[in-house]
UniProtKB/Swiss-Prot annotation:
Disulfide bonds join 59-292, 72-84, 107-153, 296-320. Gene3D superfamilies: 3.90.209.20, Hemagglutinin Chain A, Domain 2. The lineage of its organism: Viruses, Riboviria, Orthornavirae, Negarnaviricota, Polyploviricotina. It comes from Influenza A virus (strain A/Harbin/1/1988 H1N2). GO terms for biological process: clathrin-dependent endocytosis of virus by host cell; fusion of virus membrane with host endosome membrane; fusion of virus membrane with host plasma membrane; virion attachment to host cell. It is a single-pass type I membrane protein. This is Hemagglutinin. Major glycoprotein, comprises over 80% of the envelope proteins present in virus particle. The extent of infection into host organism is determined by HA. Influenza viruses bud from the apical surface of polarized epithelial cells (e.g. bronchial epithelial cells) into lumen of lungs and are therefore usually pneumotropic. The reason is that HA is cleaved by tryptase clara which is restricted to lungs. However, HAs of H5 and H7 pantropic avian viruses subtypes can be cleaved by furin and subtilisin-type enzymes, allowing the virus to grow in other organs than lungs. Binds to sialic acid-containing receptors on the cell surface, bringing about the attachment of the virus particle to the cell. This attachment induces virion internalization of about two third of the virus particles through clathrin-dependent endocytosis and about one third through a clathrin- and caveolin-independent pathway. Plays a major role in the determination of host range restriction and virulence. Class I viral fusion protein. The gene is HA.
Length: 344
């Protein structure tokens, strides 16, 4: 009896209707998606997959603040430009933020060898130990360590020099041959930096080093170079016709680095024992630091999103959505929004 009543009910319901809807319910959705064969296909439902917004700020990543270089470049920071001295108080960071046009870089003009490679190495560093590799007061008893200053590296109106390098000069009219070595006992890679001075004239060469035929030799298991100063007049840069070329190497644990010279050495003073961290990096950005926390940082600003894709910037640090160049990316969760109606 129940079965008969159900059949009668269905029959009466069909009789009262003017039309029968075949398939699925249409709606007033204007969502469009691109398919393999068609573009801008209207569908009943879709979800957005693309994050296109950011907060315009530099934020902490997982609670760890970045190292914001301010007016200093990577070169100015790592060499110890006097105007960048305050940066050494920060020993660890989530990432490094550098502005596009940093004013404080190499204060004494010259060439920085393999600079982009150094940036690449530092991009994976999340902390370091800065230490005296050759203590200033005890390492160079036969040379002067206090007169190597210059107006181009001035600090608070006075001539100065890099905080991580020492400009060795003659002492009592002599510049004895020097030989100094360091054994890496840090159990980490150690970044060592030094320079070679190229005076603008022979008079300066004699006055500073008391030799005309100088050389600088630097040797380790993975590095071996001999430098000969090039004495020549050059166009003035920051008031200097001379140049200092800057060099660096990574010293493996238990390896030894040896410096030998009879003039023109800009000696290491401080070096860095490096700790590498997954997810660190260097970004170039004009964004300002804010009291915010994020999982993903871009040069434009931080992204806080659970979406799988973003078009904010291709350079990212942290746990970030995958970058795509698309301006729209939606996934259809419904069907094509074209109903079919059949009249009785």
């Amino acid at each position: 009896m129940k079965a008969k009543l159900l059949i009668l009910f269905c029959a009466f319901t069909a009789t009262d209707a003017d039309t029968i809807c075949i398939g699925y319910h249409a709606n007033n959705s204007t969502d469009t998606v691109d398919t393999v064969l068609e573009k801008n296909v209207t569908v009943t439902h879709s979800v957005n997959l693309l994050e296109d917004s950011h907060n315009g700020k530099l934020c902490r990543l997982k609670g760890i603040a970045p190292l914001q270089l301010g007016n200093c470049s990577i070169a100015g920071w790592i060499l110890g430009n006097p105007e960048c001295e305050s940066l050494f108080s920060q020993k660890s960071w989530s990432y490094i933020a550098e502005t596009p046009n940093s004013e404080n870089g190499t204060c004494y003009p010259g060439y920085f060898a393999d600079y982009e490679e150094l940036r690449e190495q530092l991009s994976s560093v999340s902390s370091f130990e800065r230490f005296e590799i050759f203590p200033k007061e005890s390492s160079w008893p036969n040379h002067t360590v206090t007169k190597g200053v210059t107006a181009s590296c001035s600090h608070k109106g006075r001539s100065s020099f890099y905080r991580n390098l020492l400009w060795l000069t003659e002492k009592n009219g002599l510049y004895p041959n020097l030989s100094k070595s360091y054994v890496n006992n840090k159990e980490k890679e150690v970044l060592v930096l030094w320079g070679v001075h190229h005076p603008s004239n022979i008079g300066d060469q004699r006055a500073i080093y008391h030799t005309e035929n100088a050389y600088v030799s630097v040797v380790s298991s993975h590095y071996n170079r001999r430098f000969i100063p090039e004495i020549a007049k050059r166009p003035k840069v920051r008031g200097q016709e001379g140049r200092i070329n800057y060099y660096w190497t990574l010293l493996e644990p238990r390896d030894t680095i040896i410096f030998e010279a009879n003039g023109n050495l800009i000696a290491p003073w401080y070096a860095f024992a490096l700790s590498r961290g997954f997810g660190s990096g260097i970004i170039t950005s004009n964004a300002s630091m804010d009291e915010c926390d994020a999982k993903c940082q871009t040069p434009q600003g931080a992204i806080n999103s659970s979406l799988p894709f973003q078009n904010v910037h291709p350079v990212t640090i942290g746990e970030c959505p995958k970058y795509v160049r698309s301006t729209k990316l939606r996934m259809a969760t419904g069907l094509r929004n074209i109903p079919s109606i059949q009249s009785r």
